[in-house]
């Protein structure tokens, strides 16, 4: 488990390129036949990936020991979105078939979660966010047909994108975790511009569906102290509440966003005008 400490905005603005990457970038999300796990002190979110190929991968008691509990989800909820081939997730003996861009919410208290791919030639890639939970909501599969899509932006401003809301109150109940998938239209490069912060939530972006020769310049920092981190395919970045979170790519891309914090009101944002950015 890779543990990341919280960081003050006054400290963050003094960091060089490698310093920013060390604090906020999750460089390797998927490793064959393993789970990756980054634990952030910011709202206690855990992010990572699971790519089973030649064997199943389980997340159980060994992680619980690191968290001071008997098993991983004893006091946590889990959200998973599959960006790879078809797979299965078995929760305490109940098997769910999770296809490409299907998702699974796992409620607090589940003791054993086992991940598998159906075809080793096209393995599943399970990206997950995990957050502290105060009560148990039912485990539920969510398909792309069930999400709440919203299309925003314009081709003229190169930010035409569709936001697919997987884990939001309109789709299912969670304690605090919200997740979704945003896909840019072909030829569009910007996400979340004009940008915003949200004092009451933190967020993690996971960029994927990118060519090897492409990258995204992920914008971060306070609106008057902006910085950037260069992101490549299948990498994630942690965004504290005080930071903007926006990006511009060399080509169109897709990203998964996950939020935890005070509320689940999607539009609870502190908007920043482009003219006010520095």
Curated annotation (Swiss-Prot):
NCBIfam families: PRK00924.1
Membrane-spanning parts: none
Residues reported in the UniProt entry to bind Zn(2+): 196, 198, 203, 245
Cofactor: how bound: Binds 1 zinc ion per subunit.
Designated gene of the protein: kduI
InterPro entries named among the record's database cross-references: KduI (IPR007045), KduI/IolB_isomerase (IPR021120), KduI_N (IPR027449), RmlC-like_jellyroll (IPR014710), RmlC_Cupin_sf (IPR011051)
Reaction catalyzed: 5-dehydro-4-deoxy-D-glucuronate = 3-deoxy-D-glycero-2,5-hexodiulosonate
Name under which the protein is recorded: 4-deoxy-L-threo-5-hexosulose-uronate ketol-isomerase
Cofactor(s) needed: Zn(2+)
UniProt similarity note: Belongs to the KduI family.
GO biological process per UniProt: D-galacturonate catabolic process; D-glucuronate catabolic process; pectin catabolic process
Single GO term (MF): zinc ion binding
Gene3D superfamilies per record: Jelly Rolls (2.60.120.10), pectin degrading enzyme 5-keto 4- deoxyuronate isomerase, domain 1 (2.60.120.520)
Organism of origin: Escherichia coli O8 (strain IAI1)
Complex formation: Homohexamer.
Keyword annotations of the record: Isomerase, Metal-binding, Zinc
Biological pathway: Glycan metabolism; pectin degradation; 2-dehydro-3-deoxy-D-gluconate from pectin: step 4/5
